[in-house]
């Protein structure tokens, strides 16, 4: 029996988070060809809206869906925005590493928070077509755009990159692109019309984001345009501290172990919202500290 136990123990190994999602892609919203396309569009558009709003830029987003192989349901998705762009050295982490992001530890309202979404799109595209995702990024301080093909090593949760370089990025009218991001990816998915469709998602997105201009080109070449109806950006979202009522006991224990505060009252005031000096004293008196 001990030999069997040792053999079973030797077969156990830690699984990378990206390898887990590769085998359980339905957890990321890629559970059917129709929903997979909507999920990919949502993740890319959410990233564009968040980036533009954080940089205080009125969003202009272009989405294009093309059918490359109708028999195999291979679709190409292109999403372009006028956001601040991503520095070249950060592209591979943003697109090729799960749980990489700037908002995971911050308590604030935002569309993307877990650092999974767009990397999940890269992974699903690679899984279903074997092709990397092409990224083009231009930041305002540079004259040319960075371009790179991004894949994902699921065993290491690390990006693989190829064809990296720089190029001039111009609009269709020949004007230079000042800043922005373009993501081009191919995946096994289906485009459909109606309620559960990319068109419907983008239409609803334009309604709840009146400050955004969204243009969608469908597989038939028809262009759908939702213009910006206000020049006013939403108020800037600030991070807040947690409230004592909203955390679990284990979280409190971890915060206490990591704190450098010498007094519990100081810890309460500096780490939580809604805790004044008076409230901290009342709380400590109730628990006899």
Question: Which ranges hold each PLM region?
Answer:
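Short, highly conserved beta-strand within the GHKL-type HATPase_c fold
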Residues: 70-78
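Acidic ATP/Mg2+-coordinating residue in the GHKL
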Residues: 81
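A short glycine-centered beta->alpha linker in the GHKL/HATPase_c
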Residues: 85-87
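Conserved ATP-binding N-box helix of the HATPase_c
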Residues: 34-61, 119-122
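Conserved small/polar residues in nucleotide/adenosyl-binding loops
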Residues: 287-289
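GHKL-type ATPase core
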Residues: 4-5, 76, 89-90, 101-246
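Short beta-strand/loop element within the Bergerat-fold HATPase_c
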Residues: 60-70
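Conserved short strand/loop->alpha-helix "switch" segment adjacent to the catalytic nucleotide/phosphoryl-transfer site
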Residues: 20-42
């Amino acid at each position: 029996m001990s030999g069997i136990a040792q053999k079973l123990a030797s077969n156990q190994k830690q699984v990378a988070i990206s390898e887990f999602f590769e085998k359980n892609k339905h957890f990321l919203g890629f559970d059917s060809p129709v929903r997979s396309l909507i999920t990919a569009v949502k993740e890319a558009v959410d990233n564009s809206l968040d980036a533009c709003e954080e940089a205080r830029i009125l969003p202009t987003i272009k989405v294009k869906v093309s059918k490359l192989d109708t028999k195999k349901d291979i679709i190409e998705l292109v999403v372009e925005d006028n956001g601040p762009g991503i520095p070249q050295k950060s592209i591979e982490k943003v697109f090729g590493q799960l749980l990489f992001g700037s908002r995971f530890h911050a308590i604030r309202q935002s569309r993307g928070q877990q650092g999974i979404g767009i990397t999940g799109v890269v992974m699903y595209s690679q899984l279903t077509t074997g092709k990397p995702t092409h990224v083009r990024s231009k930041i305002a301080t540079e004259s040319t755009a960075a371009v790179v093909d991004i894949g994902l090593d699921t065993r290491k949760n690390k990006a693989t990159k190829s064809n990296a370089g720089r190029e001039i990025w111009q609009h269709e009218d020949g004007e230079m692109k000042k800043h922005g991001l373009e993501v081009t990816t191919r995946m096994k998915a289906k485009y459909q019309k109606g309620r559960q469709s990319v068109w419907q998602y983008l239409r609803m997105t334009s309604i709840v984001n009146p400050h955004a201009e969204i243009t969608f080109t469908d597989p038939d070449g028809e262009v759908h345009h939702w213009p910006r109806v206000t020049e006013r950006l939403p108020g800037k979202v600030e991070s807040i501290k947690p409230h004592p009522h909203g955390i679990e006991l284990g979280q409190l224990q971890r915060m206490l172990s990591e704190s450098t505060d010498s007094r519990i009252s100081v810890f309460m005031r500096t780490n939580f919202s809604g805790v004044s000096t008076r409230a901290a004293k009342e709380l400590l008196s109730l628990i006899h500290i």
